[in-house]
Amino acid sequence: MPSPAASRASVRNLLRRFRRNRRGSLAVEFALVAPVFFALLFAIIETAIVFFAGQVLESVTQTSARLIMTGQAQNAAYTQAQFKSQVVCPAGSLASILFDCTNGVYIDVESYPAFTNVTINSQIDGSNNFINNMQYNPGGPGDIVVVRMFYQWPLFVTGLGYNISNLSGSKRLLAATAAFKNEPY
C-alpha cells in the first residue's frame, strides 16, 4: 500500500504532465471556432450565389427586352407563357438550370404612351408576401415598354443571425428591370 505522500506526489506528477501535454488542444480550439467559421463561410457562399443569380436574371431581362424592343416578340405573337419558355428560359440555358422557370420566374411586360406615364409599384406587400399581378403587353412601334422579371430565391443560412430575406418564408426577391422605347419595326 503506497503512502499518502507518495500518492500526493503521483497526483502532482500527473497534473504536471497533463499541463505540459498539448495534444488535443487544437481539436478543442477548432471545436469552439468551427461553428462560427462554417456559419460565416456558408453565409458568404449563399450571398455570392444570390448575387450571381441576380446578375443572371438581369442578363436574361436585357436579352429578352431586346426582342421586344426590335418587334421580334410581337411578330412571333408570343403569349406570356411562350415568351417565358422560348425566350427567357429555353431548355439548356443558364436561366433554366439556375431557376425554376415553370413556377418561379415571373414576367411583367407593360407598355405606356410616354415615359412620364410609367408607374412601377413594389411587388412586396406589407406582410412581406409577393404580389403576383403580372401582365404581358409588349406594345407596338414607338411605345414605351417596361420589362420586369422576378424570382423568389430560397435562402438557407437565415437562422444564424444573417438574414438577407425580404419575403416571408426565408426567400429573397430578385428583380430585374429594363425600360425602353420600341423601335419603329
Which ranges hold each PLM region?
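Alpha-helical assembly-interface signal, strongest on the long, hydrophobic N-terminal helix that forms
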Residues: M1-S93
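Short, conserved structural patches
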Residues: M1-R8, T63-Y185
